[in-house]
Amino acid sequence: MPAPFEKGSEKKGATLFKTRCLQCHTVEEGGPHKVGPNLHGIMGRKSGQAVGYSYTDANKKKGVEWSEQTMSDYLENPKKYIPGTKMAFGGLKKPKDRNDLVTYLASATK
């Protein structure tokens, strides 16, 4: 079972985003979709709902509402959490890294 989310370091999360996520995602309002969707406004949104992005049926049907905890659970092992997702990222195994990244995402995607 994934570790409970605990607020982490936004600064360390920003660094993780730049090194592990930026090649496929943007976070700013109106930012473009890349290989993965723009993440602006993701917290509180259901999976597979970013307008203009072509999701797999698995992402659309999962129906998870993104929160700090669900995002942390997903980022531990995306392909296990949503079998059939096209997200190629293998996941962040360390709870601290997930906490830092999710803390950054919660702030940067508002």
Curated annotation (Swiss-Prot):
Pfam families xrefs: Cytochrom_C (PF00034)
SUPFAM superfamilies: Cytochrome c (SSF46626)
Cellular component, GO annotation: mitochondrial intermembrane space
InterPro entries for this protein: Cyt_c-like_dom, Cyt_c-like_dom_sf, Cyt_c_1A/1B
Binding site for heme c: C21, C24, H25, M87
Gene3D superfamilies per the UniProt record, alphabetical: Cytochrome c-like domain
Cell compartments where the protein resides: Mitochondrion intermembrane space
Primary location: mitochondrion
Protein modification: Binds 1 heme c group covalently per subunit.
Record PTM N6,N6,N6-trimethyllysine, positions in chain: K79
Molecular-function annotations in GO: electron transfer activity; heme binding; metal ion binding
Alphabetical UniProt keywords: Electron transport, Heme, Iron, Metal-binding, Methylation, Mitochondrion, Respiratory chain, Transport
UniProt keyword annotation of Protein transport present: no
Listed PANTHER family: CYTOCHROME C
Family according to the record: Belongs to the cytochrome c family.
Function as written in the Swiss-Prot or TrEMBL entry: Electron carrier protein. The oxidized form of the cytochrome c heme group can accept an electron from the heme group of the cytochrome c1 subunit of cytochrome reductase. Cytochrome c then transfers this electron to the cytochrome oxidase complex, the final protein carrier in the mitochondrial electron-transport chain.
Record's protein name: Cytochrome c
